[in-house]
Amino acid sequence: MIRISQDLGAGSSSCRVDPGGIAEAGSRLRASLEDKPDLVVVNKFGGLEKSGGGLADELLWAMAEGLPVLTAVSGRLVDEWLEFSGGHCDLLRPDEAALWQWWGSQRLYQDLLLGVADGPIARITRSAHWLLIEGPDACGLARIPRGADQAGRSLEDFAAQGLRQLASLVNSIDLFEAALGLAALNAHYNRPGLEVGGGNGLDAFAEEEGRVVAIGSFPDIARRLPNALVVDAQPDAHEYPAAAADWLLPGCAAAVITASTLANRSLPRLLDLARGSRVALAGPGTPLTPRLFSYGVEILAGFIVDDPAGMAQCIAEGATPRGFRQFGRQVTLRRPG
């Protein structure tokens, strides 16, 4: 810890800035910026920075590099801050909800990756529609997105990468690789010993009186959520096309979103559209981790594999999620409060 102020003695409520401390803090901060941190936090934008001193150069450097910068600005210095930053900033309320909204739902992928421990991959199994990855502690499932190119993809080569490296493929623009990355994430998070409840994700909002939107044509949805407005990439006569999410999600009472949106990278945008509404992320490919609660998800309805060998055979034979149930269980994880 570097002190940048000096006490003026007993009985004084003031302090003065220590030039040596400022210089050392600036040097340390510049060195840290070279490593491209996820977030730069500077205690405050004060009188020194307003005049071009203090940590002004480091703040400008971080912003010029495109790094997210968070600092406190007093009301009397707001105009000076806007001039200093050139207006390229967001003024936030000092509360957690505003901070998470500023942070952005697109960062949830990196957040999920930060929690993954490395380890060997025992097996990868695929069918035309599903992937199963068996890691050191659990199995993870993911649906392969429509349009994913599986031709000539060696599962052995992917398995040799290890769990953490394979999970990083969730950031890939290649749909098959992104699905592998999601399955690897789930092979870390969806562990048999996890403290979770039971239940089907479609039941989460069965009693909701307002508009309920389902992103994805879930099996059995007509019975479990008969009044839901269903949005699907390939809608039938009673469903809406994908573009309808733009006007159906804002202001809805609740939304059930398929976990497949993680692999096709549409989830962040859908969460932004549904901001302020109750949201459940549902499907066998749902990562069961509280990390997703901060991004607006209230309920995680996923799947835990209890019989890896049986599930691998089930996937290899091309079974649907209905057939998964004899080798694992549907579970829910709810945001506290």
Residue ranges and their predicted role:
Residues 58-75:
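Substrate-engagement module of ASCE P-loop NTPases
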Residues 60-65, 224-225, 247-250, 271-276:
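Short, conserved loop/helix-junction motifs that constitute active-site signature segments
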Residues 84-101, 280-337:
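C-terminal functional extensions of proteins
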Residues 100-219, 315-317, 330-337:
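Electropositive, gly/pro-rich neighborhoods at or near active sites that engage anionic ligands
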